[in-house]
UniProtKB/Swiss-Prot annotation:
Location of region: Disordered: 220-281
Residue stretches of biased makeup (Basic residues): 258-271
Superkingdom in the source lineage: Bacteria
Functional note: One of the primary rRNA binding proteins. Required for association of the 30S and 50S subunits to form the 70S ribosome, for tRNA binding and peptide bond formation. It has been suggested to have peptidyltransferase activity; this is somewhat controversial. Makes several contacts with the 16S rRNA in the 70S ribosome.
PROSITE patterns, per database record: RIBOSOMAL_L2
Protein known as: Large ribosomal subunit protein uL2
Compositionally biased residues, Basic and acidic residues: 272-281
Single GO term (MF): transferase activity
Example of a GO cellular component annotation carried by this entry: large ribosomal subunit
UniProt lineage: Bacteria, Bacillati, Bacillota, Clostridia, Lachnospirales
Length: 281
């Protein structure tokens, strides 16, 4: 999928780029796999803001994606490649031999008419989903399970892929896109190939309005707020924050403070952090 540019008939249009959607084969989703999506604008069930800078955006419906890929031994034909407004990756509609339909993440290179399959006996080719125990070492994979049967949780965004580095005993070692080296049980499943829509990172939004269409509201600096709104606020002009270091709106240290729990159970599965350092046990 390529990137298209626009004629600069307005200043914001000058640097704007977008996807040409050349891989998309239909604009109408499968009705049986679409549900309504309610907007919460970052509020919880009490109406309190739990996530700032969310609200508005274009209306969208949620496409039910099969991240588990548990239908083993039955081949499926790729019917369409579709746009999904809820994620950066494109999705593929597949139809199994028994008539069941499902959406999966569309890997790079997957074409309409190709067949995909799930299970330990599946062929080693792009789009097939297998346990890590059956995938050759060195393969590029995505949609990786952290726990067997839970469904893919890792490496699902556009253009991403992880590499299967080694297998030892009950665990496989993966190199994630961030550079982190992590162990995952070999009974967990993963899909072969790289997630499609690889040019997504080259898109330049170009103007604030496109960000608002995505449901993202403006982020305001604390230093320009009033002191009752933020610890950095107040003062005449560009006054300093008056603290040893920056803090969050709730007074917690920001920028550089480690937030991961030191006694988290999954720490033992991380062999190397994304910054190249060993994780302190």
């Amino acid at each position: 999928m390529g990137i298209k540019t626009f004629n600069p008939y307005t200043p914001s249009r000058r640097h704007m780029t977008g996807s040409d959607f050349a891989e998309i084969t239909t604009s109408t989703p499968e009705k049986s796999l679409v549900v309504s999506l309610k907007k919460n604008a970052g509020r919880n069930n009490q109406g309190k803001i739990t996530v700032r800078h969310q609200g508005g955006g274009s209306r969208r419906k949620y496409r039910i994606i099969d991240f588990k890929r548990k239908k083993d031994g039955i081949s499926a034909v790729v019917k369409t490649i579709e746009y999904d407004p809820n994620r950066t990756a494109n999705i593929a509609l597949i139809c199994y031999a028994d008539g069941e339909k499902a959406y999966i993440l569309a890997p790079n290179g997957l074409q309409v008419g190709q067949t995909v399959m799930n299970g330990a006996t599946a062929e080693i080719k792009v789009g097939n989903c297998l346990p890590l125990a059956n995938i050759p070492v060195g393969s590029q994979i995505h949609n990786i399970e952290l726990y067997p049967g839970k469904g893919g949780q890792l490496v699902r965004s556009a253009g991403n892929s992880a590499q299967l580095m080694a297998r030892e005993g009950k665990y496989a070692t993966l190199r994630l896109p961030s550079g982190e080296m992590r162990m995952v049980p070999i009974s967990c499943r993963a899909t072969l190939g790289q997630v499609g829509n690889i040019d997504h990172e080259l898109v330049t939004l170009g103007k604030a309005g496109r960000v608002r269409h995505m449901g993202i509201r403006p982020t305001v600096r604390g230093s320009v707020m009033n002191p009752n709104d933020h610890p950095h606020g107040g003062g005449e002009g560009k006054t300093g924050i008056g603290r040893p270091g920056p803090v969050t709106p709730w007074g917690k240290p920001a920028l550089g403070l480690k937030t991961r729990k030191k006694n988290k159970q999954s720490n033992k599965m991380i062999m190397r952090r994304r910054d190249g350092k060993a994780l302190s046990k």
